[in-house]
A protein has these predicted regions:
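Alpha-helical transmembrane segments and their immediate juxtamembrane cytosolic regions
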Residues: 1-346
Length: 346
């Protein structure tokens, strides 16, 4: 039986599990049915990745940590072993098996394997920002770090928007920024927000326990969904993106926190979500190998599809893909050596 560390927080693992299910659900729609929007994915995408990165930041923050040279190098080395080495191994295997090995595979999306690479970049950026701008852990230093994260997020957001217009003028920089998955840096603000919430968690709980605050957050998220044309107005697209991401993430986090008894190990679905949450890296790395690709011709499905009908179909497929991924992960983890280099296990 798997030994679960006592310091793990059940509802956090369950929330990660839900986020992982939504990622696989999205990939079922994208790779299996040829659409990024069916099955309400156009709504889910507003908070799916923001929630994932928020949790990553929340878990990464540690009160009292001093970013001296030894801590910085040790942490970056540790994250490199966990995030980059397994990703390189699985990505190369995937590219070879599916005959996709060419230079374009190492662009911003990396055939789907961008998440762990970008998360490593977030760790490095955050660590360096804290070490250089907030060594005394002051309010001023905290603001400086926030400004850096916000500017990076805005720059990446608008780079993605205007990429096709200016790509030809970037020359070599286009390839460098693609290799670094710079367009994905737009989510770094949610990673920072996770660290900020963890640092000020008591205040966060006090605010989100207020029914009026949660009502406003739900209203903001709903407004952006109901009036999507707001997103197309020049100059405020980023504000809408930020509000949707933050409100959606806070709503999800608060729901799991305030209903944590339902997501504990005392319930069957709580145990299931926590298991998925503890194995998000394994599932992420493996699931591309077992996704059902090209289930139907995209134009056929898009012509006759129905969102409500699609949801149970895609969820069943998503759970099946996750189950197979967990079984494969369990086989690999029999070997401590493979567990270390394939999944960053200690």
């Amino acid at each position: 039986m798997e030994q679960i560390p006592k310091n793990r927080i059940g509802y956090i693992d369950a929330l990660r599990g839900m986020a992982m299910i939504l990622v696989v659900y999205f990939h079922i729609a994208a790779y299996g049915f040829g659409s990024y929007e069916i099955g309400y994915n156009d709504i889910i995408e507003r908070f799916r990745m923001p929630t994932f990165f928020f949790i990553s930041g929340w878990l990464f923050y540690k009160a009292g940590r001093i970013w001296d040279r030894q801590t910085i190098t040790g942490m970056i080395r540790k994250k490199f072993m966990v995030q980059i080495i397994p990703t390189v191994v699985f990505m190369l295997l995937y590219l070879v098996m599916f005959n996709l090995l060419d230079v374009t595979s190492f662009g911003s999306d990396k055939k789907g394997y961008w998440f762990t690479v970008v998360l490593f970049e977030y760790f490095v950026i955050y660590i360096l920002a804290e070490a250089l701008l907030n060594r005394r852990d002051s309010a001023t230093g905290e603001i400086h770090v926030f400004v850096i994260m916000l500017l990076l997020s805005i720059a990446a957001f608008y780079y993605a928007k205007y990429y096709t217009r200016y790509a030809a003028e970037l020359g070599t920089w286009k390839d460098i920024l693609g290799f670094l998955s710079f367009v994905k840096i737009r989510h770094i603000i949610f990673f920072w927000f996770g660290t900020f919430v963890r640092k000020h968690f008591d205040r966060f709980i006090y605010l989100t326990d207020n029914r009026y605050v949660t009502a406003v957050l739900i209203g903001l998220f709903a407004a952006i969904i109901v009036w999507p044309t707001v997103l197309s107005v020049n100059g405020i697209e980023y504000i809408a993106y930020l509000i949707a991401g933050l409100s959606g993430t806070i709503i999800c986090f608060t729901y799991f926190r305030t209903h944590q008894e339902y997501f504990s190990r005392n319930t069957w679905y709580g145990r299931g979500l926590q298991l998925i949450g503890r194995r998000t890296l394994d599932i992420y790395l493996i699931h591309y190998f077992v996704l059902p690709y090209n289930l139907v011709q995209p134009e056929v499905w898009l012509q006759y599809h129905h969102n409500t009908l699609f949801v149970p179909i895609a969820l069943i497929l998503a759970f099946w893909v996750i189950l197979i991924s967990l079984l494969i992960s369990s086989l690999f983890r029999v070997s401590p050596l493979l567990a270390k280099y394939l999944f960053g296990a200690k």
